[in-house]
Each structure stands twice: as C-alpha cells, then as structure tokens.
C-alpha cells in the first residue's frame, strides 16, 4: 500500500477585501475553498485549471509562504501549520519549489553556481561546495563552465535547469512545480519534462505539478485534479481521467487539446464554455460552474455538489450533479 507524503485536508485560503473610510472587510476572495488532496510517496499529482482558479495559491500555501484561513496540511503524517520558525526551516529541506518564470526567479547579479549553492550555504552544507554544485549542474544537463555565468547568458530552458538544480540541492522529498514549463518553447518544454521525469526516478522525488495545459502533464502525472474557482472539480488516476472524464469542465478542457490527426480534429465536436471566469470575490451560488456549464439545470443554481465517487469508482471523484457518462458523450459527438 502506498504511503501518503502530503495530505491536504479541507484547506481554505480566503483573502479579505477591505474598503470604506475605516477599511473594514467587506467580502473575501476564496482563492482556495475546501480542498482535499493526498499525494503518495514517489507519485506525481497534477493540478490543472484556468488562470485564477487557485492552483498557484494552493502551491504557496503548501510550501508555507502563506498561512491558510482554515484546514490542515500534513507532511509525513504531521501537521505543519503550527510549526515554529525553526521547524519550518528544517521542513523546507524536504519541500522545495520550482517557479514558473525561470528568469525572475533567479538573482540577475548572482552567478549560476552561487544560485544553485545558495540553499547549501543556508543550511551550512558547505563542505566541497563547488564540487557538489557542479555535480548538480551535471545532473540537470548544464556544463561545469556554466558555473561562472550570469542568468542573462542562458536560454530560458537553461535558466529553468538552474532553478531545478537549486530546488534539488538539499535532497528534498517533495517538489512543488508551479507551471515550470509554461514560459518555455514547446520543444524546450519536452526536454525539461523529460529531465523532471528522470530526476524523479533517480532521486525518488514526489511532485505536485501545477499546469494550465492538460497536455503538459498527460504523460507525467499519476493522479490529475482539476480546479475551478478554488474548488477541486474532478480528480482521478491519469488513465481514468483522460479516458473517462466525467465533469463538464474537465471535458471542455480536454476537447481544447488539438488532435494530431487533422481529419479527426475536423470531425470532433468541442465543448465550448460560455462567458468568462467569474470573480472569486463574487462566485456564483450553488455549483460555481453552473454559469458556464452547457448541461446545467435549475437545481445546480441553488445547490452545491460535493466531490464524490460516481458509478462505484472510488478512485474517481467528481463534483457534479449531472456528470457526463458514455451516452452523453455519444450525444455530444453526434
């Protein structure tokens, strides 16, 4: 049986909106709203969704950059929300993050070797520092001569490799990958994803891989979850997710992925969502997706669905009153 490394229990991250002369709180932005997730050791959990769905806020909350409004985060079975500063300092040896923009996440005045070695210095692991840094550089596909170069002398893909080398310097157990390839060219994306897969096998890493493109994590994630307005809409193992997605939002995202066969692409019917993503400061009542859902009923406007198994598949959870089944998919394609 797989052992849970990270557990997220009913996590909420609400940001107050203040206004008026006395700056009183008028409402809250529910960036993360009742999220429950489990990541087992050695697995990759993929989190996808549109911009503003709360996935990056979730990442920052997991790593401790912001304290949640309520809920709990467990790492190796222990709650980390009330850790002291010293305990958090030790925890960050085991949880590291790779950021979206490979340029702004690097100090432009520091040499690549110093950037990669910074975590080692912070934890006073300075014995044979230069040799260790060059080993890390070799591990991510950088040359030893790159040690003395500045970030602007590298390509986008190389800069992201520097960020990855820095993240694995302390031999962490969990990496939070916050859209690590979204700022890169498609050809470079594949190289970086292959690197991450190789590192996971070699170093026994566990990933939380955040992306806005389902095609990016199709071949890397063991478990895939979709977020919308701070909530998890659907989550399952990768095979079930891509072959038997049940939530209308998930199916809309999947139908937006181009097919390699032009004939099949031309014949395929897409699920087109109407309207724009509502404001998280003023989410719709009932099911938060009902304003854009092509299958929404009156019941959806006043009642909130829960994330639960459908048709007896305990590993496939859907937050929808009227999930898409095989018959409905056939009607869509006709």
Residue ranges of model-derived segments:
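P-loop NTP-binding/switch modules centered on Walker-like glycine-rich loops
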Residues: 184, 188-266
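Conserved ABC ATPase "signature" region
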Residues: 128-145, 254-255
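Conserved ABC transporter NBD signature motif
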Residues: 71-79, 91
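Helix-to-loop junction immediately C-terminal to a conserved catalytic motif
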Residues: 63
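Short catalytic/signature loops enriched in Gly
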Residues: 4, 18-23, 237-334
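A short, proline-enriched helix->beta-strand linker immediately N-terminal to the Walker B motif
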Residues: 169-173
């Amino acid at each position: 049986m797989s052992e849970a490394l990270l557990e997220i229990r009913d996590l909420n991250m609400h940001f107050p909106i203040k206004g008026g002369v006395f700056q009183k709180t008028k409402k809250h932005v529910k960036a993360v709203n009742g999220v429950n997730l489990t990541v087992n050791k050695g697995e990759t959990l993929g989190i996808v969704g549109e911009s503003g769905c709360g996935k990056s806020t979730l990442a920052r909350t997991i790593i401790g950059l912001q304290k949640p409004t309520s809920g709990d985060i467990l790492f190796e079975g222990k709650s980390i929300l009330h850790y002291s500063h010293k305990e958090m300092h030790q925890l960050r040896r085991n949880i590291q993050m790779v950021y979206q923009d490979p340029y702004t996440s690097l100090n432009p005045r520091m040499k690549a070797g110093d950037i990669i070695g910074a975590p080692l210095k912070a934890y006073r692991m300075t014995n044979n520092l230069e040799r260790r840094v060059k080993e890390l550089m070799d591990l991510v596909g950088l040359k030893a001569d790159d040690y003395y170069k500045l970030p602007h002398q590298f390509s986008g893909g190389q800069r992201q490799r520097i960020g990855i080398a820095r993240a694995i310097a302390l031999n962490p157990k969990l990496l939070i990958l916050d859209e690590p390839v979204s700022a890169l060219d498609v050809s470079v994306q594949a190289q970086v994803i292959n690197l991450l897969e190789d590192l996971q096998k070699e170093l026994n890493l566990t990933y939380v891989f955040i992306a806005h493109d389902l095609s990016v994590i199709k071949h890397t994630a063991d478990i895939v979850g979709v977020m919308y307005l701070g909530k998890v809409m659907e989550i399952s193992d990768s095979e079930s997710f891509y072959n038997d997605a049940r939530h209308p939002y998930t199916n809309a995202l999947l139908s937006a992925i181009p097919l390699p066969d032009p004939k099949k692409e031309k014949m395929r019917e897409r699920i087109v969502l109407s309207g724009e993503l509502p404001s998280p400061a003023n989410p719709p009542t009932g099911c938060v997706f009902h304003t854009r859902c092509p299958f929404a009923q009156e019941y959806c406007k006043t009642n909130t669905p829960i994330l639960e198994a459908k048709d007896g598949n305990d590993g496939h959870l859907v937050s929808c009153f009227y999930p898409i089944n095989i018959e409905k998919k056939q009607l869509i394609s006709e």
